[in-house]
């Protein structure tokens, strides 16, 4: 359970609409300075900080900091110097075709079968098979490694596409009807472990805005990004 449930929520500034993927350390530091002047208490670095994520067609699934693009330790230290908290964006349930994770484990993708020539793309991304324990464990290990090095105060947990191929390699044919249910259980299992291990981090749920507002999500995410128009 998030330790700060009884506290007033900080005023949040999110980097996304201001720069999208086009940023470096200097630009983010300038955003932090400007946002502090207008009363921001929590600065959130959105999409674009990880892997080879120069646009929305690559990098999802590779949750390591792109140090050639941004010095995240410097960014976080600057926030602390100004008395601000720091947050980061993740989309743990998705993967791009152009990613280290997909190249190493295409079978982690929902609907993947040997010999299949194509999967349904949405926003240039595929859905990971969270019905499979190995997939959940891989993403957990990546996120935990990040959180052990970068002590963030907030995570924006995003989810930006629908489920298309309703097939899991983790389930036998007679249980494929359970795919939706098992995907959700995998999501709960991952976010449950992380919120238990890092109770000081506020997890905010997002799904292209308020697209995932179920009671299970609210159990783990005491705050929801209600609309991408905000």
Annotated model-derived regions:
Residues 4-138, 144, 154:
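Aromatic-lined carbohydrate-binding/catalytic grooves of carbohydrate-active enzymes
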Residues 66-73, 78-81, 103-230:
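Active-site neighborhood of glycoside hydrolase catalytic domains
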